[in-house]
Amino acid sequence: SDYIRYGCRVDITADNSPDESVYPTMADFTFYGGVYRDVNLIEVPDCRFTMNDYGSDGIYITPRRVGEDGWELSIKALIDNADCSHKARFTLIDADGNEKASTIADLRPIISAKLPVEDPVLWNGRKNPYLYTVRCEIFDSTTEEVTDNIDIRTGLREYHIDSHKGFFLNGEHIKLQGVSRHQDR
């Protein structure tokens, strides 16, 4: 960047003007203005997973059952500057560090990919909080050099709510208890 150099001071100005594209715009508690948490300067490659999708890392992973025993992860990845000569690789890694599945996709602004999951271990809250890791990488298709990567931990589970019987996780009725609490500072 022409504006930021290592070793120089960076001044930040905060604007607390209402913005309808950012939730929440109204609330039952006081909004504080300004910067009241740490600020980090992040250096990223030109071709990367987006960092500007409303606070997300630009990668959305949805587990779903396929047939009786099969599962798959549906992946949607948002890419900045996708016109580079790179590719994306998505790898499913189990809790022991073993690679279970992998796929490679051409780079474009929105990538859709699927990863099959054989013999899955289902996430089951406190009983079995088993998590897989989905390693998401952008790499140079010529040199194989990884230029951006994000590891996302995710669980495989299905749930539904019955208006008479309550909440079900992986086919088992679960009694939910909780509190209403928010953090504003």
Spans of model-derived segments:
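Secreted/periplasmic carbohydrate-active enzymes, especially glycoside hydrolases
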Residues: 1-185
